[in-house]
């Protein structure tokens, strides 16, 4: 299925998209011509998304069949052969991890906790919201195949009312099937009070706000039943587990990870626009802050100064497995890719391309869309396909 996207997006008044009626329509009517044109183009883009995704899925199926046939016949290039074998290895690890969960064999799980603070929906652009959703998918995939996975990952401030744009994005990711993950409409302040033995309630029912229920449609109401806050997961105990907000602006350095602590990662993509955001929030809530001991490594990266949410999480789980911060950081972002001799524009472009391909292949493979296959560099990662299981 081929889609002439450019022609469709630039279509004139005859295009099927219409300015909506009611409140949204009134808002658009007050816009300038340029703003209205931009809004109409965005509406047309939303219309063709299902078509693009269907076309991409078909292209992937064809590519997967070609790879399977070529692998069996021994006619693949070395690069394609390596990618196929890597994907098989990751798929094998995924199945083994799933087997352990289903059999109740979680003895190797790390019994501390990680919180993703999603209380920044209003500070991100739509593009950043999309990136945040993708990062949450990568994070889940990493944890599910980790040598020592985190038993409890809580996502706070997540609902149609608390984080409307992220909620909408995440509908395509089947988040409610993710193992070891807990989702709260309530914010970080509620979690803090629940872990405080002087204020926490031993038995509390999951509560979804009336505002959220009023906004919910039929499908959304079924998803709302998967929100578990403010019930603290059974492996975390009030009075025992302490919160630690990870912030690059913190004075204290995190020397090791403790199963008596819950580490908070700020769920925001802001390209470093908002200075001291997480540090300030933690101080306001009275939560201890600490920074990862990787400052010397960050200084060696000429093109990367801000770590993504999934990269921070990956460093944590790699440290849990390796017991060494330097080895953990090197495993997540290899320093060799940023050697002084490779600081040319071409080298940087190649590095970014390779990292993107590696991430997409690993992420897709971990979810087992097919037995053999790769996501090519030009392919758009479809969350509906990539994160469809568990």
Swiss-Prot record:
Alphabetical GO biological process terms: tRNA N1-guanine methylation
Entry-linked Pfam families: tRNA_m1G_MT
EC numbers, comma separated: 2.1.1.221
Keywords from the named record: Cytoplasm, Methyltransferase, Nucleus, S-adenosyl-L-methionine, Transferase, tRNA processing
Keyword Transferase: yes
Top-rank taxon, per record: Eukaryota
Extent of Basic and acidic residues compositional bias: 43-59, 347-356
Gene Ontology molecular functions: tRNA (guanosine(9)-N1)-methyltransferase activity; tRNA binding
Subcellular location: Cytoplasm; Nucleus
Active site as annotated: 270 (proton acceptor)
Residue numbers binding S-adenosyl-L-methionine: 246-247, 266, 270-274, 278, 292, 305-307
SAM-dependent MTase TRM10-type domain: residues covered: 92-340
Role played: S-adenosyl-L-methionine-dependent guanine N(1)-methyltransferase that catalyzes the formation of N(1)-methylguanine at position 9 (m1G9) in cytoplasmic tRNA.
Family membership noted in the UniProt record: Belongs to the class IV-like SAM-binding methyltransferase superfamily. TRM10 family.
Name of this protein: tRNA (guanine(9)-N1)-methyltransferase
Naturally occurring in which organism (per UniProt): Cryptococcus neoformans var. neoformans serotype D (strain JEC21 / ATCC MYA-565)
Gene assigned in the entry: TRM10
């Amino acid at each position: 299925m081929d889609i002439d996207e450019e022609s469709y997006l630039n279509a004139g008044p005859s295009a099927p998209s219409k300015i909506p009626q009611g409140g949204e329509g009134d808002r658009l009517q007050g816009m300038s011509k340029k703003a209205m044109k931009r809004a109409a183009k965005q509406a047309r883009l939303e219309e063709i998304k299902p078509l693009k995704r269907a076309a991409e899925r078909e292209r992937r199926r064809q590519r997967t069949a070609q790879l399977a046939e070529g692998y069996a016949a021994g006619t693949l290039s070395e690069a394609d052969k390596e990618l196929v074998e890597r994907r098989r290895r990751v798929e094998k690890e995924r199945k083994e991890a799933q087997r352990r969960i289903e059999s109740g064999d979680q003895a190797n799980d790390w019994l501390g906790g990680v919180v993703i603070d999603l209380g920044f929906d209003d500070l991100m652009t739509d593009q950043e919201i999309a990136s945040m959703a993708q990062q949450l998918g990568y994070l889940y995939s990493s944890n599910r195949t980790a040598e020592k996975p985190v038993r409890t990952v809580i996502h706070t401030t997540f609902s149609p009312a608390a984080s409307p744009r992220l909620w909408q994005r995440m509908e395509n990711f089947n988040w409610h099937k993710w193992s070891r993950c807990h989702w709260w409409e309530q914010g970080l302040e509620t979690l803090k009070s629940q872990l405080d033995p002087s204020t926490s309630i031993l038995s509390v029912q999951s509560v979804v706000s009336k505002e959220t229920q009023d906004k919910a449609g039929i499908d959304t109401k079924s998803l709302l039943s998967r929100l578990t806050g403010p019930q603290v997961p059974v492996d975390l105990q009030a009075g025992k587990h302490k919160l630690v907000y990870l912030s690059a602006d913190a004075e204290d350095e995190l020397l090791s990870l403790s199963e008596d602590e819950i580490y908070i990662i700020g769920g925001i993509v802001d390209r470093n626009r908002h200075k001291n955001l997480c540090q300030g929030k933690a101080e306001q809530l009275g939560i201890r802050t600490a920074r990862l001991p990787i400052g010397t490594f960050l200084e060696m990266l000429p093109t990367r100064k801000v770590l993504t949410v999934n990269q921070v999480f990956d460093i944590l789980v790699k440290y849990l497995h390796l017991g060494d911060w330097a080895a953990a950081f090197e495993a997540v972002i290899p320093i060799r890719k940023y050697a002084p001799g490779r600081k040319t524009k071409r080298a940087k472009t190649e590095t970014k391309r390779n990292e993107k391909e590696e991430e997409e292949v690993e992420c897709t493979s971990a979810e087992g869309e097919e037995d053999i296959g790769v996501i090519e560099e030009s392919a758009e990662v479809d969350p509906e396909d990539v994160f469809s299981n568990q």
